[in-house]
Structure formats: C-alpha cells, structure tokens
Amino acid sequence: MVQAWYMDDSTEDQRKPHHLQPEQPVSLEQLKAVGVHSFSLDADRYESDPELAKIRQENNYTWMDIITIHKDTLPNYEEKLKIFYEEHLHLDDEIRYILEGSGYFDVRDKEDRWIRIFMQKGDMITLPAGIYHRFTLDENNYVKAMRLFVGDPVWTPYNRPADNFEAREKYVQFLTQTV
C-alpha cells in the first residue's frame, strides 16, 4: 500500500524521502481529499489479474502500456527525469501501476504544500486531472510501471503556472467541496 507524508523544503537529492521533521504522515483518507486514489494489487499477476481487469472496466481504462525508467532502458534518461520532476498538471487523470521497482509522486495539498507518495511494486495510483504534481525515482533508480488511459494516450504536461485550463478550474472547485 502506498505511503505518504508531508515533505521538507530541502533541495538536496530529489530521490531521498524528504520527510518533514517531526514526520507528518498523510493517510489514504487525506489523499482522497485531494482526489488521489490508490489500490494495492498483485503485480506478479498483472496480465491476468481479475481485480486489475475490474478496475480497468469500471473506469474505462481502455489503453495501456508499460514504461521502464532506468538509465539503461529509457532514451534521454537524464532529460526525461528532469521533465518528470518539473511541477505540472495534465488535462486527463494520470494512472500508474508499479510492476517493479519504486518511486515517488509528489502532489500539492489544499494549502499548496507538497505531499510525497511512495509507490512500490503492486501499488496503483490515480491522480486527478488538474492536480499539480511531479514524479521522481527513489534511490534505487528503477521503476517499471503500467500507464493507463481512457481512450488514446495523452502525455502532455503543462508546467506550473497552468491555472487557466478547465481541468485545473474543475480540480480547484473539487478542492473547495472537500472537507
């Protein structure tokens, strides 16, 4: 199951955990309050997992691929890592399922503070359209993840500030309706 916490303001190595001191864990309920949902699945059975099939059907995730992020497998590795870590939003939900390895998704809470979400094998997460976020590997420098989409894939990131998009406006409206 994913683990989450509030981050410190350090600019040291982004691959480190960056816990606030004292630590401030973030619960799954707190993640849901910012629109982030998570699932724990059996990554060893992803090709035939009925639970994954059910999630895909219920959410109309009709397209998927698998990406491996490692210096030996991802073209333009260093450049891609910088792009992934730039704070941005998407106009569609972002769905990721970790099949191997581990990494961090960072998302903003209602007060614009960073929440770090640690994901490892078997963890699946959905980030709502319009949420500011970023991704980085952890110190293992490796992740293999399934990317899921409703319809054709769109990977266009809109770097912050991107408040003028309808997806962002809808997300901000969602935040005002949650406790």
From Swiss-Prot:
GO CC, any one term: cytoplasm
GO biological process: L-methionine salvage from methylthioadenosine
EC number: 1.13.11.54, 1.13.11.53
CDD domains hit by this protein: cupin_ARD
Subcellular location: Cytoplasm; Nucleus; Cell membrane
UniProt entry keywords in alphabetical sequence: Amino-acid biosynthesis, Cell membrane, Cytoplasm, Dioxygenase, Iron, Membrane, Metal-binding, Methionine biosynthesis, Nickel, Nucleus, Oxidoreductase
Keyword Transcription recorded: no
Source species, domain of life: Eukaryota
Cofactor note as given: Binds either 1 Fe or Ni cation per monomer. Iron-binding promotes an acireductone dioxygenase reaction producing 2-keto-4-methylthiobutyrate, while nickel-binding promotes an acireductone dioxygenase reaction producing 3-(methylsulfanyl)propanoate.
Gene3D superfamilies assigned to the protein according to its UniProt record, in alphabetical order: Jelly Rolls
Function, in words: Catalyzes 2 different reactions between oxygen and the acireductone 1,2-dihydroxy-3-keto-5-methylthiopentene (DHK-MTPene) depending upon the metal bound in the active site. Fe-containing acireductone dioxygenase (Fe-ARD) produces formate and 2-keto-4-methylthiobutyrate (KMTB), the alpha-ketoacid precursor of methionine in the methionine recycle pathway. Ni-containing acireductone dioxygenase (Ni-ARD) produces methylthiopropionate, carbon monoxide and formate, and does not lie on the methionine recycle pathway.
Family membership: Belongs to the acireductone dioxygenase (ARD) family.
Subunit architecture: Monomer. Interacts with MMP14.
Name of the protein in its database record: Acireductone dioxygenase
Organism in which the protein naturally occurs: Xenopus tropicalis
